[in-house]
């Protein structure tokens, strides 16, 4: 069973190891339960590393009912959260894979969501837009482990 504290993960920099997409989603759901709103979470990792799987778990943990897919072609998708347990109303999912520069992200209006207390912003391929991220952003890096399903997940503050 995965039991995680965001604070302990950040303080001790101990990576979490998941052995399946289901475990990665479970980790994300645990993190979702600790979110208050206003957070920006940057996701870093190679293609197929588990970033979108993580967002799916985060969304489920926040009570999103819709199917969550990577917004590679639309760049940004806003999911409405109607779960009364949360003050968070919007999960903003951004995929920067196709961006050639940070300005392209500004052009879609993402800055209006940064720091909003009723929103959480999650950005795949965040390394491409690091210069735009708020200073207190959480950065989560995904690396492949010993087999094709294992992931080593490190959470840090930016």
Predicted regions and their residues:
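Hydrophobic anchor at the beta1->P-loop junction of P-loop NTPases
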Residues: 41-43
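Conserved lysine of the Walker
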Residues: 51
